[in-house]
């Protein structure tokens, strides 16, 4: 079995691929900075037991992380408990992409994985919209060149900032409102957050296509909140909730 681990700012997603290269199951835990490598090992061991599998049967691991301290703990866990040196997505790893970024090391490992999976599944050119803690856009042209991207505040961050800075505005849940025009403060905030974020997504994608001359680019959405926005978007064509894990599997295979 092989583990694909995506360490994000809000959650850590672990995909388990079986001997037939199929995604067998997924574990999700909240991203916290107080767990040790031993605690992560115990958590995964428990998850495997619940699925009737053996944690020690894992023979390969790949990690994409935007949280370096937690990545180091997972690497230690793999070495101590699985006796495996994990593949870390970063400089020197074969991805099939040409990174056209001023400093290629600045491109997040999760964004690279998303781009690899999007090309494999839908071809290039393509634009990947990852809707999570931040909402990011990745632009890949027909020659598999990663041209760059856009990073915007996520919907949850924007809503939290609004509540924190405006004393009379309450905290709200991210949800699709019943109508665009709200009749209460909460309904108005829900509408502004939901439709405002969709308008931002569609507007940015449209501008990317125009500026980069990628009118035929496929637009793929992923991320923890993608399900909430993809259906209402006029630009998003495909929803791939586990795009990052798929990309990690492709990258792992390229490096064997």
Swiss-Prot record:
Chain positions recorded as substrate binding sites: 101, 108-111, 185
Positions of the catalytic residues: 110 (proton acceptor)
Binding site for K(+): 130
Cofactor(s), by name: NH4(+); K(+)
GO biological process, one term: coenzyme A biosynthetic process
Binding site for ATP: 6-13, 133
Subcellular location: Cytoplasm
Example of a GO cellular component annotation carried by this entry: cytoplasm
InterPro entries, alphabetized: ATPase_NBD, Type_III_PanK
Function: Catalyzes the phosphorylation of pantothenate (Pan), the first step in CoA biosynthesis.
HAMAP family: Pantothen_kinase_3
Family affiliation: Belongs to the type III pantothenate kinase family.
NCBIfam families reported in the protein's UniProt record: baf, PRK13318.1-6, PRK13321.1
Subunit structure, as described in the record: Homodimer.
This protein's name: Type III pantothenate kinase
Gene: coaX
